[in-house]
């Protein structure tokens, strides 16, 4: 709670009556300009007292300051029975625990904030003693103000109305800050701060308070509404989630190839639909799956080969598509660079022409302060942009804006310093149409040159693209040729292996045949007759031998025939390989 006192002029007498004493603290340098005045309706707000209040060291002066008493309960205008304003008396500094009364008096020539009182002094319960005086302040009165803050507001408003109507004398008005009063009384207006405007400074010339400082029940209702709106504001602040937009596919992009099963499904779907027109997609897919499972590996390989061929074509098309995208990006970047270069050249020409004019003007001094107008016979030529152009006599013609207040004695030295013929007289201020046409023609020529350069760049880019396509095609052809050569080499290697295997088989057959011949020869050696013995038994036995051995030549003849046949069978087989 801040109670502000404003001292009067220096040299006031020490002995003052009550009105003068209160006027000393209630008046400022400019007179009665207090705000948020509190008064009583019956002019009995303050009561004189015999006790004196000793201020801190301001000399030997002593001032009588009466205590501030609450309004009587019998006031019919307030309409608030059993309610007392909890204002305490201003007493000497008390040595209480942590409750310090620290007055601060400014110099008499300045309006600075003065006395500051601790909050605990206002909220203390019990009896406050001050030089023999005491005032009872019960806990129930403070709790009533905390429970019903609107009554406090009504009392304050009523007191300000009474002060306006002139019931109280101006010497009995005291300034009290409204926000600090409500904070020290422990008011809780629905969890929100009471909106109030800053009071008028003490230097104002009117003694009546501002109407914005009065607070009533409607202000409290408005604060409650504002709190409700603030609570609902975060809910409404939530932004709805925007769905992500899908990127549109480029129609020129090649489509991915389909699998072998998808190709088989396309081929068989129409036939199944023709046989079963009422079949659903799920039933058709089941039938196709069963048919795919029942297919042989050779039939499946046919569809797989088709998919592989489609994949190769897709890779080729994708490479070409990406190359085209790269070329387009390069073309766009080249166009942007050309546009930037043109803009930079135009800006540089404008800067150079303006710099030439500025340097020439700075060399010949500043323009005098007194404005001088050109003769009426000299017309003004205004050009939007300064341009430099080459004339046959190597003269630089720049567009100059001649103002009405420019002195006429600048033209000759400016022309002599630049070494060029500039527009300064009747004949030179007006640009001839031939010069304008020449400028226009130069601009057209520049534009044509730029277009030609752009066309050349585009053609060069197209050639590069064509070369890139050719290189890609050559690479693909080389890869295809290499693949074909690898397949051919593999086939040749397989054939060579087969030949080697067949030769090994023939060699094995020959070895077997030789072994058979050796076995036959061995058998023949074993079958040959042993030497004859001179005995009757041998004669008897040998007699039938010729009969038995007679068929041996036939068997020997048969063996060469078998050998000749086997040789004739082996020779044609060897000739084949």
From Swiss-Prot:
Polar residues: bias regions: 529-543
Bias kind Low complexity: ranges: 203-214, 470-480, 518-528, 550-577
A Pfam family hit: HMG_box
GO MF annotations, alphabetized: chromatin binding; chromatin DNA binding; phosphoprotein binding; protein homodimerization activity; transcription coactivator activity
Keyword terms of this UniProt record: Activator, Apoptosis, DNA-binding, Nucleus, Transcription, Transcription regulation
Tissue expr: Expressed in the cortex and cerebellum.
GO cellular component: nucleus
Positions with biased composition (Basic and acidic residues): 222-238
DNA bind region: 254-322
One GO BP: negative regulation of neuron apoptotic process
Keyword DNA-binding: yes
Biased composition (Basic residues): 239-249
Subcellular compartments: Nucleus
Region (Disordered): 188-258, 470-490, 518-577
Annotated domain remarks: The C-terminus is required for calcium responsiveness but not for transactivation activity. The N-terminus is absolutely necessary for transactivation activity.
Function, in words: Transcriptional coactivator of the p300/CBP-mediated transcription complex. Activates transactivation through cAMP response element (CRE) sites. Protects against cell death by inducing antiapoptotic and repressing pro-apoptotic transcripts. Stimulates transcription from the estrogen-responsive or BCL-2 promoters. Required for depolarization-induced transcription activation of the C-FOS promoter in neurons. Associates with chromatin to the estrogen-responsive C3 promoter region.
Quaternary structure note: Homodimer. Interacts (via HGM box) with CITED1 (via C-terminus); the interaction increases estrogen-response element (ERE)-dependent transcription and protection against cell death. Interacts with CREB1 (phosphorylated form). Interacts with CREB1; the interaction is not depolarization dependent. Interacts with CREBBP (via C-terminus).
Name of the protein this chain belongs to: TOX high mobility group box family member 3
Organism: Rattus norvegicus (Rat)
Gene of this entry: Tox3
